[in-house]
UniProtKB/Swiss-Prot annotation:
The keyword Transmembrane helix does not apply. A zinc finger (C3H1-type) spans 662-690, 694-717, 718-744, 745-772, 773-795. It comes from Mus musculus (Mouse). Interacts with SMAD1, SMAD3, SMAD4, CPSF2 and CPSF3. It is found in: Nucleus. Residues 344-360 have a biased composition (Basic and acidic residues). GO terms for biological process: mRNA 3'-end processing; mRNA transport; positive regulation of activin receptor signaling pathway. This is Zinc finger CCCH domain-containing protein 3. Required for the export of polyadenylated mRNAs from the nucleus. Enhances ACVR1B-induced SMAD-dependent transcription. Binds to single-stranded DNA but not to double-stranded DNA in vitro. Involved in RNA cleavage. Residues 370-388, 839-849, 857-888 have a biased composition (Low complexity). The gene is Zc3h3. Its main location: nucleus. GO terms for cellular component: mRNA cleavage and polyadenylation specificity factor complex; nucleus.
């Protein structure tokens, strides 16, 4: 693609050269043809592509001075790049053929142009002129901002060649091979040669019958000039400085016109018989001067209205550095450009060296050859006439040190000033200069007040020169050595406090000056705004004007126009009571400052952790000079704003506290399953006693806490009980079975509400009300792993436990025999026995004190069924869930019961398989004496306890 682009650029360049050649050296006018001396513009199609044929019919009555208008419209370079792709074909041609016209009087011609790419990477362009000598009055192509020029009518013998140096050649990549342009026998030859280290040369050799020498047209990559060589018999004709815009990195016309318009007499390799070589600059038309002056004046007016900042421009791009010129500079540059082009001087203007010190430049610098790689860029599209700050001119020194009144700058490293260093003319006109002392080309040094920089011998104390500056009285405040803030008065914005890094716009009624200092400052202007920034970014603006958007950034050239940050120390230093001329503070200042008081806006506030309360009196009222106007007192307004802000903050804190205390519309899982919650009143979930799980011991008739101290519910509800596993198998014969007899599908999901302890749907719920993981019960492996909310019970242990001699059932003997027969008696290994003994010992030790934290952990490993024999058939497992609960103890319970060792706590508490059990201290001892009671409950049909095997 890069090679294609290079080829396209070269083809365009050569076509432009050919058109220029025809423009300047068209065939001689035909005899007797009145329209031969007039321009005959081409009628190009809209999308002109290579390989297409198009006609160039002449137009009647189109004089030569109308050239630039149609050139701009039908320019060859203005076409998009994608319109032609000539490099895809090694040999392609563009032919120009005229079409038959209805008018017999205008002359028409056929121009055949062939562009070929030879195999040795050479470009061959052939142009076949028409057979009639007077048919061609070729027209040039204007590129970019080519200036309009009047072509003279050639009356004598036409010149044979010319040398043209075109800018932009250095932007085109050099090709290793030469590009040759060949012609037919009778055609003029254009040979484009590019040798390394030498400029690109296009030789135009005319194969004419006479013995006139050959001339060449040179395309240089360094400068712009037009060298026209004539025989001695020809009159002196003028040349045109062609500013051709080639490629994206092209220079504008203003650069070429103002900065680089000169004529260079070049050496030509011609015999001595050629005669003298004459090269003169063509006088510029009024359109050129008008465009140049309009361009510069537009830039000047734009600069006056906008803020500008330094923006690093690309070093490769020779674009104009957008600097603004003063009216005087603009006038001088316009006059010099006009006079320099009209005068027939042959020596070129001297170039501006970027390394030359700007103090030595007597003339304004040329935009085309800017010594700085930075350019002005507008930072604000809108401009305001009323500004916070004004440009002040300071006379009395020769070098016109630019100084902007109150605002310090943070210049970037390597930036160069726009108007050059100190000895240039005033940049913004007669009465506007910036507040910076430019010491060198790389540093911008800020001036402090009116004092000169030490070491600058040439500077004298500046004096006000305009009528607006008589109000500007500056006075240093004798506070603290170097960093003492300086109060300055600007015409429309009240006092400005300037220290090393900040600028504060203070209303006059809030400036705390001593009586002696306040008398020296002009106080006649009412305050317009105020900005206060404290710890909580408190900002108060009066409706008369806004400090941030419209007025403040309109006059600041290079820094951001945001709210000026003020630290609390600066606020306290600025707003403290007045300091006397001797620099001693009032004796009352440390007293109120050390007691947690702060003076904000002249009002004393008492500061606490989250409260700001206003006090009744102001400190040191005698030493302060309050400047009151007809408006509302800004100090009172500020105090009200701060007080309301503190109130809003307090209310926000209260709202946040209330939101934290609000109960979520969700029941507490721990409270529902265990009857208690370790968080107590701090738990954000709902603790509803009606939703607590049913006491399984009460269901079996073995709960001793019938006085109401049992944490579980003694109200049996079907919504709280799991589904009877025997009912699902169809073998439950107990008419008074407390468990839910609801049939659900095997593929149904586990009810998440039931896992939390309570399902509001109850018997209508279509999901499984179980706590045992069905995947783990069937396969022994759960795909969810530790994140499963259901209990993973080991089947081997249940089978070993069901091998106890008395095997009870929930209803009668028949189901018990089935349940016992369905289990396989397996002898546990020694490792399992040791693990069981250790886990049972730990469980007993944790449950003995009946402390609340271990009780949910032990109880979580219990099951909800009243029959131990139904545990093997996965009736309702123990309610240990690993769901994300509001407490960490549930996760610990899951980790303890999910594994084989953790679930061995069932060995110590095998008396029931229930949701919960009361953490009574005797829970451990109850399992022992429950074994002899098994025969009685066996006859009564109630479920029996299983004696643990130790």
């Amino acid at each position: 693609m890069e090679e294609k682009e290079q080829l396209r650029r070269q083809i365009r360049l050569l076509q432009g050269l050919i058109d220029d050649y025809k423009t300047l050296h068209g065939n001689g006018p035909a005899l007797g043809n009145s329209s031969a001396t007039r321009w005959q513009p081409p009628m190009f199609p809209g999308g002109r592509t290579f390989g297409a044929r198009y006609s160039r019919p002449s137009r009647r009555g189109f004089s030569s001075h109308h050239g630039p208008s149609w050139r701009k419209k039908y320019s060859l370079v203005n076409q998009p790049v994608e319109s032609s792709d000539p490099a895809s074909d090694p040999a392609f041609q563009t032919s120009l053929r005229s079409e038959d016209s209805q008018h017999p009087e205008p002359q028409q011609y056929v121009l055949e142009r062939q562009v070929q790419l030879s195999p040795d990477q050479n470009m061959v362009i052939k142009i076949k002129p028409p057979s009639k000598s007077g048919a061609i009055n070729a027209s040039g192509v204007q590129r970019g901002s080519l200036e309009g020029c009047d072509d003279p009518s050639w009356s004598g013998q036409r010149p044979q060649g010319s040398e043209v140096e075109v800018p932009g050649g250095q932007l085109q990549p050099a090709r290793p091979g030469r590009t040759k342009v060949g012609y037919s026998v009778d055609d003029p030859l254009l040979v484009c040669q590019k040798e390394p280290g030498k400029p690109r040369v296009v030789k135009s050799v005319g194969r004419v019958s006479d013995s006139s020498p050959e001339h060449r047209r040179t395309v240089s990559e360094n400068e712009v000039a037009l060298r026209v060589h004539f025989p001695s018999v020809l009159p002196h004709h003028t040349a045109v400085a062609l500013g051709r815009k080639v490629g994206p990195h092209s220079t504008s016309y203003s650069e070429q016109f103002i900065g680089d318009q000169r004529a260079n007499t070049g050496h030509s390799d011609q015999p001595a018989s050629l005669g003298p070589v004459v090269a003169s600059v063509r006088p510029a038309t009024a359109r050129q001067v008008r465009e140049a002056s309009l361009l510069v004046s537009c830039r000047t007016s734009k600069f006056r209205k906008n803020n500008y900042k330094w923006v690093a421009a690309s070093e490769k791009s020779p674009r104009v550095a957008r600097r603004a010129l003063s009216p005087r500079t603009t006038l001088e540059s316009g006059n010099k450009a006009t006079l320099g082009t009209v005068g027939k001087t042959e020596k070129p203007q001297p170039k501006v060296d970027p390394e030359v010190r700007p103090e030595k430049l007597a003339t304004p610098s040329k935009p085309g050859l800017s010594p700085s790689k930075y350019k002005w860029k507008a930072s604000s599209p809108s401009a305001s006439s009323s500004s916070s700050f004004r440009w002040q001119s300071e006379a009395g020194s020769k070098d016109h040190t630019s100084q902007l009144s109150p605002v310090p700058s943070r210049p970037t490293s390597g930036d160069r000033p726009a108007g050059g260093p100190s000895s240039l003319k005033p940049l913004f006109g007669e009465s506007q200069l910036s507040a910076y002392k430019v010491k060198s080309r790389t540093k911008i040094i800020r001036r402090r007040g009116n004092t000169s920089i030490p070491g600058d011998k040439k500077n004298s104390p500046t004096t006000a020169t305009t009528s607006k500056n008589h109000l500007t009285q500056r006075r240093r405040q004798a506070l603290r050595g170097k960093n003492s803030p300086v109060l300055r008065k600007t015409p429309h914005k009240g006092l400005m406090q300037v220290n090393r890094h900040r600028l504060c716009c203070l209303p006059s009624s809030r400036t705390h000056l001593s009586t002696k200092e306040a008398s020296s400052v002009h106080m006649g202007i009412p305050p317009s705004n105020k900005v206060i920034k404290t710890r909580y970014r408190i900002v108060k603006k009066t409706p008369s004007s806004s400090f941030g958007a419209p007025s403040f950034p309109s006059s600041l050239p290079s820094w951001r126009a945001r709210r000026i940050p003020l630290s609390r120390s600066l606020v306290l230093n600025r707003l403290r009571p007045a300091i006397t001329g001797g620099g001693k503070a009032p004796p009352g200042t440390p007293r109120w400052r050390n007691k947690g008081y702060r003076c904000i806006g002249g009002v004393l506030y008492k500061v606490s952790a989250n409260k700001l309360s206003k006090t009744s009196s102001r400190p040191s009222d005698g030493n302060r000079t309050l400047l009151r106007t007809g408006r509302l007192d800004p100090a009172t307004t500020c105090s009200r704003s701060l007080a309301s802000r503190a109130i809003q903050r307090s209310l926000a804190i209260i709202r946040q506290a209330k939101q934290k205390k609000e109960k979520k519309r969700e029941y507490c899982m721990y409270y529902n399953r265990f009857g208690r919650c370790n968080r107590g009143e701090c738990c954000p979930y709902i603790h509803d006693p009606e939703k607590v799980a049913v006491c399984t011991r009460f269901v079996r008739g073995t709960c001793k806490k019938t006085d109401g101290s049992c944490p579980f519910s003694h109200h049996v509800s079907k919504e709280k009980m799991p589904v009877c596993s025997y009912f699902l198998k169809g073998i439950c014969s107990n008419s008074n079975c407390p468990y839910s007899h609801v049939y659900v599908s095997r593929k149904a999901e586990v009810c998440s509400d039931f896992l939390k302890g309570y399902c509001p749907l109850g018997a209508k719920c279509k999901k499984k009300h179980t706590l045992l993981c069905p995947d783990f019960a069937r396969r022994g492996i759960c795909p969810r792993g530790s994140q499963c909310q259901l209990l993973h019970r080991n089947q081997k242990r249940h089978g070993r436990r069901t091998a106890a001699p008395p095997i009870p059932g929930p209803s009668d003997g028949a189901p018990r025999s089935k349940a016992s027969a369905g289990h396989v008696l397996r002898k546990p290994t020694t490792t399992q026995r040791s693990v069981r003994q250790m886990s049972s010992g730990l469980a007993s030790g944790a449950e003995a004190p009946a402390s609340p934290p271990p009780s949910p952990r032990v109880l979580a490993s219990t099951s909800t069924l009243s029959s131990k024999a139904t545990a093997a058939s996965s009736p309702s497992p123990s309610p240990s869930t690993s769901s994300p609960a509001p407490s960490l103890e549930q996760e610990e319970a899951v980790s303890g019961t999910g594994s084989g060792t953790g679930s061995s706590g069932l060995c110590k508490l095998p008396s029931f398989i229930s949701l919960h059990s009361s953490p009574s201290p005797g829970g451990q001892t109850e399992t022992g004496p429950q074994a002899p009671r098994s025969p009685r409950t066996k006859d009564s049909g109630k479920p029996l306890h299983i004696k643990p095997r130790l």
